[in-house]
Structure formats: structure tokens, C-alpha cells
Amino acid sequence: MKASSVLLGLAPLAALAAPTPEAELSARQAQQSIDALMKAKGKLYFGTATDQGLLNTGKNSAIIKADFGQVTPENSMKCQSLENTRGQYNWAPADALVNFAVSNNKSIRGHTLIWHSQLPGWVNNINDRNQLTTVIQNHVATVMGRWKGKIRAWDVVNEIFNEDGTMRQSVFSRVLGEDFVRIAFEAARKADPNAKLYINDYNLDRPNAGKLTKGMVGHVKKWVGAGVPIDGIGRQGHLQSGQGNGLGQGIKGLGDSGVKEVGGNELDIQGNNGNEFGGGNKACLPVPACVGIPAWGVRDNDSWRPQGNPLLFDSNYNPKPAYNSVVQALK
């Protein structure tokens, strides 16, 4: 048999053995998985935000499997997405994310139960204290109950402070005052006693800012002291270039509030030079309460604010200098 015939005979076998692009991507990224590096430093995860549509797009799911140990639903668990009509739930998109995470051994952060934005009109129109209390309790119990035991942590209340540390005006604060925080957290603890319960907000990166000191830290200390079951504070990080340098002080300030956990949530940095992403993750390492950092997405053009290339991967799913800076910061 001629050599050419042998080669031709082997060609189909070689084609069958050739790895798929997704397999090649997984193998390449897993060699320096940022989630594995974060866990090697004693933390719980390096995470990202995604949803059903993104998981079915391009190489998103392959990168998440290889590089990220935690997922947060970007929109599918918000009230308007889940219960736009009272008592009628749209579970499919969030179920898809939970099923993906469970089947791939990823931790899940539920986001978010009580938020003034992306809120159905029927909730905003409530004026009766007892009615709103019941709505909060039922929504929390129903949503958390569906995935009880599958979701590690929940953002129970989200973005409730103004920049000066006062409470934001919303239907919740208007009708219930700040007592809606207690109502929501007590309902959450009852719904899933083993889940970690978080309060989440942005602009908590400046150590002397009113939102951090008077708002988040001051209120959380008071609420925890009164028995409100708050386990952790989520610090969003939707930043501009140059703002990443304050992450360390902000994380430490939150850790001083007395909560058990601090999660650096929703990190993206517009116009970053690469080094700031690494610095933001390194800032978590010396703070015992800091359990991990989630980026807010995988690649730039899928970001909620794609201008300024704020994420770790470019539009072709190639790791950027920001990705490499995280790897170096965690080694």
C-alpha cells in the first residue's frame, strides 16, 4: 500500500480525533483558570454574570466552564423578569442558568430579590403596608424556595442607599420605611436557612464616602445588632479607568462592618489598562471576609456597557491584558 493511501486511510480517524474549538478553548483556558487561582488563595470563587441567551452564544459557556467558578444571573431573577404579573412566574430563563451551574459544579449567586428598578408596575402601585409586606414575603419565599439548596448566596436587597448614606426613595421605603429590610431578610432566612444573605450596592469604593460609612456600614451594624440576618455585603464595581485603585480600602471598610462575608460583585472597568483588574482582585486576598470576585460578564461586546472594553475577553473571546493581570495577581 502506498504511503499516500495510508495517509488517506488515516485522515478520517484524524478528523474524528481532532478536538472541537470549544474543547481546545477549555483546555487552553483551564491551564491558568482564574477560578482555580482564586481558590488556591483560600477564596471561594472567581465568578461572572451570564444568562440563558449568553450561555447559548459563541464560546461563553466554554469559557465559563473553564475559568469561572460562580455565576450570577444578569437579569433573569429580577422581579420584572420573574413576576411581571402578580402570581405568574416566568421560570424558564433562570431555570436554564441554574441547571447549567448545577451540572457544571458552579456556585450560584441569586440576584436580586428586592430592588427599586426593573420592578413591575403592580408593585410600585402598592400603598398599603400590610399588602406590601405580604408581597415581599410571598415573592421571597416563592423565588428562593424554587432553588432551595442550589443557590449559595442571595442579594436580598439591592441599591437601597443614596450617595450621602440616606435611604433611597422607593415603594419599599415609602410604604414601610427601612423596616422593609428586616422583612425581606427574615423572609429569606425562613425560605432557605443555609443560603448566605447579602445586601448589595455600588459606589462603596471610597473609604470615607457617606454611602459607605453612614449608609452601608452604619446601617448594617445597626441592623445586625437588632437581629436582622444579614450575612454579607456585596460591593458592586462598575468603574472607570483609575477608580480600581480604591477597591482595597473599600473592601476592608466593608469587612469592618461585622458581617461574615464581603463579595466584590459586578466588576467591570471601562478603559482599564489591564492592571486595574488584577489589582481589584488582589485587593480581596488579605481581607478574610472577602470570599471572591465576580466579573460582570465574559466578553466586552456582551457587557451592559460595552463602550470602553470593560471585561476580560475581547469580542473574539481572546483573553485581554486585563485577564493576564488577574492571572499574575493571583499567582
UniProtKB/Swiss-Prot annotation:
Gene3D superfamilies hit by this protein: Glycosidases (3.20.20.80)
EC number(s) recorded for this UniProt protein: 3.2.1.8
GH10 domain boundaries: 31-329
Phenotype of the disrupted gene, per the record: Retains 39 percent of the catalytic activity. Double xyl1/xyl2 deletion mutant retains 19 percent of the activity and exhibits a 50 percent reduction in accumulation of total mycelial mass.
A Gene Ontology term for the protein's cellular component: extracellular region
Known pathway: Glycan degradation; xylan degradation
GO biological process terms held by the UniProt record: xylan catabolic process
Family, similarity comment: Belongs to the glycosyl hydrolase 10 (cellulase F) family.
Protein name: Endo-1,4-beta-xylanase 2
Source organism per UniProt: Pyricularia grisea (Crabgrass-specific blast fungus)
Gene it is expressed from: XYL2
